[in-house]
Amino acid sequence: MCNINLPVIQKNIAKEQKILDNARKKMYYKADFPKDFYWPIDGRISSPFGAERIINGVKQSSHSGVDIAAPMGADVKATADGLVILAQNDLFYTGGTILIAHGGGVVSGYSHLSEVMVKNGDNVLAGDIIGKVGATGRATGPHLHFTLSWKNIRVAPEFICKTCCPNRDE
């Protein structure tokens, strides 16, 4: 029999949500706001932005990002230049999670990572490898949950991102 302590789990989830909310509130100012945003990985979108989510027969909030199917361990790249404002290895819902502030209130998020390769305070460039695709947190298989937000308002990445990230080695 599985022994689940629901109050403890709920307390941990609330604590993690506060960590995420506080990270998203951090202001980051850049004189040279990125003009281009790229997809962080090549892959098929397995769940689009805004999709209705039903879990155990109960309607949930709309999907706040896009899920991109990709092989376990595939490189995840920064969508644009920015500052890492959160790098966590194991959050309950989102597993390995990175948030990057790009200036002007724009933040990108990368979740379910098997490996987080940056730390809080790191400056990254578009195309830098920041993590590896995984199935951590509440995930049913390997994929990247990718989000973009502007001042805490979720934005559909399809309207902002160009093709996949440039190769930083070239």
Residue ranges of each PLM-predicted region?
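Non-catalytic extracellular/periplasmic "stalk"
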Residues: 1-44, 48-49
